[in-house]
Amino acid sequence: ILIGLVGSEMCIRDRFHIVKFQQMAKAAMEEIYAKGKIPVLVGGTGFYIQAITKDIDFTQAEQEDGYRQELEQLAAEKGNEYLHQMLLNVDPVSAGEIHANNVKRVIRALEFYHQNQSPISAHNQEQKEHETPYNLAYFVLNVPRELLYKRIDDRIDEMLKEGLLEEVQKLKDMGYHRGMVSMQGLGYKEILAYLDGEYPLEEAVRILKRDTRHFAKRQLTWFRREKDTIWMNKDEFDYNEDRILDEMLKVCRDRGIL
């Protein structure tokens, strides 16, 4: 129900974030419940899923435009590692969990410390310990690592065929650059580096595939740390989607969801 509601312009200009997602998702869920239906939350970003399932309180983490812009400028001038070192100095737990290239999350953690004089890692741990307000079944669809990596490589090849290079070139022509937090996303920063003459296209594609595989590995690590996840190893079902769906429906019925 939320697909297509957020335009690329909003994302690129950093006007969409987890708090807005939580607000929109909860409103959509209420709309679905009102129709007598069961919401299905689908996605791959663990923190966004957790924001809903644990109903995380973000009131202490409201964004402060002036300080955020100051941090973005520091990242642009001195690099991601400089910003990450700032985080390491005040919140080593978060620094250990957040990659230096994930500038958006580094900035969010620094903002939180700036506003509350306490680390966001402590706040997040407190929120994680909350019991979910929902009767839910948390499924994680999983495939063998070698197949996952092949699919990632194939998907990136397809993205290039569908115009990733042209899309990033258009954004560059509009004034977007690697110093912007939104342009640190996978696909953007690697292609921008190529367009800036830092390395050949073949190297940009190699780095993009490598970093996407690393990202997928971190996602799997996140889900393994989550409580009450139900892992659906697709090879155990011979990749038969009907069998997988039947098992998921059985779990939902057993839990009184259906």
Q: Model regions: which residues?
A:
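Single conserved hydrophobic/aromatic residue that forms the stacking wall/gate
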Residues: I1-G7, I12
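Long, charge-dense, solvent-exposed interaction surfaces that engage phosphate-rich ligands
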Residues: G46, I52-E158, M174
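Structured helix-beta-strand junction loops
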Residues: A28, K35, E77-K78, N89-V90, ...
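Residue-level signal for inorganic ion chemistry
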Residues: G7, G44, A109, G163, ...
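Phosphate-binding/switch loop-helix module in NTP-utilizing enzymes
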Residues: R13-F47
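Gly/Ser/Thr-rich beta-alpha loop segments that engage phosphate groups in nucleotides
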Residues: V6, T45-Y48, D57, P119, ...
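Conserved catalytic core of sirtuin-type NAD+-dependent deacylases
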Residues: V19-Q22, T59, D65-Q73, L165, ...
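Catalytic core of IPPT-family isopentenyl/dimethylallyl transferases
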Residues: E131-L258
